[in-house]
Amino acid sequence: MSILEWFWNILCGMAQYLTFSKNLTNDNLVNIYVKSNVGGTISVNLDPKSDIKNVKELVAPKLGLEPDDVKIIFAGKELLDSTVIEVLDFFSDILHAVKVNKKIKNVIPDKPLCETLEELHQLNDQKNVESIEESNLKNEGKNKAHFFIYCANPCKKINTGKLRVCCSECKHGAFTVDTDPQSWADVLDKNKITGVCNNVGCEGLYAKFYFKCASHPSQGENDTAVPLNLIKRNHKKIPCLACTDICDPVLVFSCDNRHVTCLECFKNYCGSRLKDRQFLSHPDFGYTLPCPAGCSNSFIEEVHHFRLLTDAQYEQYHRFATEEFILQAGGVLCPQPGCGQGILIDQNCNRVQCSCGYVFCGKCLEGFHLGECLNPTDVPFLSQNCDYPLDPEKLEKARWDEASSTVIKVLTKPCPKCRTSTERAGGCMHMICTRANCGFHWCWVCQGPWERDCMASHWFG
């Protein structure tokens, strides 16, 4: 794409966005953008009751052609002259005008994609075949979107979406499909549906399907959204597996049983698993969850479904996913309270220093120490030298709350030799362990033996 074409697309997108609120004029005319396959975009005003034949009559003279020499393409279909504008799944989108090439076999005009998908949906339902879902609910005639998407910009939420088609090679919208998609696999997988690209100089053979948000005016051909293929209209009236209510829409898991849950119960399910940190790290799908019934082959592949969580929960989900990735890669998380930064470590080096300044052992995640790591029950307590021994497990249960242990970890560091917690109350960084039979000299900063380098660099911090 040249700089001029890129700049033109930006201007078209801005014009569409700024003028959409004025699309309905005093004469009830709708402003429509028609893009030619030889470059340039034409703006025409039409009555919503107008048909494609009227579009050709307005557009053809501006292209120097006769109406019969022009075909109009929208969402992978060459439209019939009798197709009425208002029945299209159209929301400030772009129609494509292409000169008819009489030397080659042209595609037979067809119904718009939104109508043919309705017919396919009913047929596939009878055959019990997975199909692209659409809504048969009443009072939804004006909303032709049959999909759910996550709109990252500007809506930043889950909305209904609309299916669009372009050439997989040049990404131009003047592409007609040979057959309609029969399943989600046809839409999501590459090179499933063949067709003809009408863009000059392109010989692309495969369709690329993508989705746009139906809740805001199109911001250009590059305005896309993430499809949420598990969220569907509940036209079958299936009850939720948790609350047994019949809700719409619902989420249908990919397990063999195709378990159904309402969106509210799905949010509760994800929230409880997130709180207990029970999401699983899948090698192909990332940090995700399976069907709550424990079915095999039921992991959620598109993680944007978790956008149903609150912003705070989704931020926590992202943090946990990042931490899990680091742990799976052999890294560690800084044990310093209030930090938790992920660190990829050298497996041959036990001494790890976080950017927060905390130095710890890469194996046991305790403060850095010399010698072998000790089991938690082997860590010495100062109280063991008196007549009042404390059991670590019972001591853990006897806490008022976790605040005291957090303060201790922040204000103290363990002796690198014997692990006795030591608090620094000012002064220099030269520490001497006070535990009997230890007396190890060490550096508060690097948590290693007190040496000349420490004297030079760390004496006062």
Curated annotation (Swiss-Prot):
<keyword id="KW-0597">Phosphoprotein</keyword>
<keyword id="KW-0963">Cytoplasm</keyword>
<feature type="domain" description="Ubiquitin-like">
    <location>
        <begin position="30"/>
        <end position="90"/>
    </location>
</feature>
<feature type="zinc finger region" description="RING-type 2; atypical">
    <location>
        <begin position="415"/>
        <end position="446"/>
    </location>
</feature>
<feature type="binding site">
    <location>
        <position position="197"/>
    </location>
    <ligand>
        <name>Zn(2+) 2</name>
    </ligand>
</feature>
<dbReference type="InterPro" id="IPR044066">
    <property type="entry name" value="TRIAD_supradom"/>
</dbReference>
<feature type="binding site">
    <location>
        <position position="240"/>
    </location>
    <ligand>
        <name>Zn(2+) 3</name>
    </ligand>
</feature>
<dbReference type="InterPro" id="IPR041170">
    <property type="entry name" value="Znf-RING_14"/>
</dbReference>
<dbReference type="InterPro" id="IPR054694">
    <property type="entry name" value="Parkin-like_IBR"/>
</dbReference>
<feature type="binding site">
    <location>
        <position position="334"/>
    </location>
    <ligand>
        <name>Zn(2+) 5</name>
    </ligand>
</feature>
<feature type="binding site">
    <location>
        <position position="443"/>
    </location>
    <ligand>
        <name>Zn(2+) 8</name>
    </ligand>
</feature>
<dbReference type="InterPro" id="IPR003977">
    <property type="entry name" value="Parkin"/>
</dbReference>
<keyword id="KW-0677">Repeat</keyword>
<feature type="binding site">
    <location>
        <position position="167"/>
    </location>
    <ligand>
        <name>Zn(2+) 2</name>
    </ligand>
</feature>
<feature type="region of interest" description="TRIAD supradomain">
    <location>
        <begin position="236"/>
        <end position="461"/>
    </location>
</feature>
<feature type="binding site">
    <location>
        <position position="369"/>
    </location>
    <ligand>
        <name>Zn(2+) 6</name>
    </ligand>
</feature>
<feature type="binding site">
    <location>
        <position position="433"/>
    </location>
    <ligand>
        <name>Zn(2+) 7</name>
    </ligand>
</feature>
<dbReference type="Pfam" id="PF17976">
    <property type="entry name" value="zf-RING_12"/>
</dbReference>
<dbReference type="InterPro" id="IPR047534">
    <property type="entry name" value="BRcat_RBR_parkin"/>
</dbReference>
<dbReference type="InterPro" id="IPR002867">
    <property type="entry name" value="IBR_dom"/>
</dbReference>
<keyword id="KW-0808">Transferase</keyword>
<dbReference type="InterPro" id="IPR047536">
    <property type="entry name" value="Rcat_RBR_parkin"/>
</dbReference>
<feature type="zinc finger region" description="RING-type 1">
    <location>
        <begin position="240"/>
        <end position="295"/>
    </location>
</feature>
<feature type="binding site">
    <location>
        <position position="170"/>
    </location>
    <ligand>
        <name>Zn(2+) 2</name>
    </ligand>
</feature>
<dbReference type="InterPro" id="IPR029071">
    <property type="entry name" value="Ubiquitin-like_domsf"/>
</dbReference>
<feature type="binding site">
    <location>
        <position position="361"/>
    </location>
    <ligand>
        <name>Zn(2+) 6</name>
    </ligand>
</feature>
<dbReference type="GO" id="GO:0008270">
    <property type="term" value="F:zinc ion binding"/>
</dbReference>
<feature type="binding site">
    <location>
        <position position="255"/>
    </location>
    <ligand>
        <name>Zn(2+) 4</name>
    </ligand>
</feature>
<feature type="binding site">
    <location>
        <position position="291"/>
    </location>
    <ligand>
        <name>Zn(2+) 4</name>
    </ligand>
</feature>
<feature type="zinc finger region" description="IBR-type">
    <location>
        <begin position="315"/>
        <end position="373"/>
    </location>
</feature>
<feature type="active site">
    <location>
        <position position="428"/>
    </location>
</feature>
<dbReference type="GO" id="GO:0004842">
    <property type="term" value="F:ubiquitin-protein transferase activity"/>
</dbReference>
<feature type="binding site">
    <location>
        <position position="339"/>
    </location>
    <ligand>
        <name>Zn(2+) 5</name>
    </ligand>
</feature>
<dbReference type="Pfam" id="PF00240">
    <property type="entry name" value="ubiquitin"/>
</dbReference>
<comment type="similarity">
    <text>Belongs to the RBR family. Parkin subfamily.</text>
</comment>
<feature type="binding site">
    <location>
        <position position="155"/>
    </location>
    <ligand>
        <name>Zn(2+) 1</name>
    </ligand>
</feature>
<feature type="binding site">
    <location>
        <position position="364"/>
    </location>
    <ligand>
        <name>Zn(2+) 6</name>
    </ligand>
</feature>
<feature type="binding site">
    <location>
        <position position="373"/>
    </location>
    <ligand>
        <name>Zn(2+) 6</name>
    </ligand>
</feature>
<feature type="zinc finger region" description="RING-type 0; atypical">
    <location>
        <begin position="145"/>
        <end position="227"/>
    </location>
</feature>
<feature type="binding site">
    <location>
        <position position="262"/>
    </location>
    <ligand>
        <name>Zn(2+) 3</name>
    </ligand>
</feature>
<feature type="binding site">
    <location>
        <position position="213"/>
    </location>
    <ligand>
        <name>Zn(2+) 1</name>
    </ligand>
</feature>
<feature type="binding site">
    <location>
        <position position="356"/>
    </location>
    <ligand>
        <name>Zn(2+) 5</name>
    </ligand>
</feature>
